[in-house]
Amino acid sequence: STPIKSSAASDVYKRQVEKKEVSFLDIELPDVHGENTKLSSVATGKVVLINFTAYMSEWSPALNMEFGDLYTRYHDKGLEIYQISLDSDLHFWKNAASNLPWACVRDPQSVYSQTAALYNVKQLPAIFILDRKGNLVKRVDDVKKLEADIKSVL
């Protein structure tokens, strides 16, 4: 796992994220084409897997393969993925993310990301699940249980 630098971001929202079923904090970051993509643009009426990641990490390819399998199986049932990269190397990230079928955005603040701090992300990868109503219902601690977690809210 990759540690995230601590920040003096909103302590109130951090406490809310620790609770179950809070509304999500919208995120708007640039995608591989430089267009800003909002989390809310993919979340309407969908179950969303939010992933804070670093493509340069050794665990990233295997995790993205797992996400690809889940996306293939459950996208037509309402699953979306919103993946936030904290990679510092823009070109590496663009090359790695350009062929992924889900929303891939990058926070140029890298490990100093205020967005990651607001979601109380202390290390990568960090995975959250939103239900169809936009409630943050799960912080995934075990990737092996990710499919069951997704199925429980689809």
Residue spans of the language-model regions?
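Single conserved hydrophobic/aromatic residue that forms the stacking wall/gate
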Residues: 1-9, 13
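N-terminal "domain-start" segment that seeds a small globular fold
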Residues: 11-40
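Loop/turn elements at helix/coil->beta-strand transitions in domains of secreted/extracellular proteins
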Residues: 44-47, 77-79, 100-101
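Active-site-proximal beta-strand/loop segments in catalytic clefts of secreted hydrolases
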Residues: 52-53, 84-87, 107
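Short acidic-hydrophobic, aromatic-tinged amphipathic segments that line or gate anion-handling sites
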Residues: 103-108, 140
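Thiol/disulfide oxidoreductase modules built on the thioredoxin-like
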Residues: 111-153
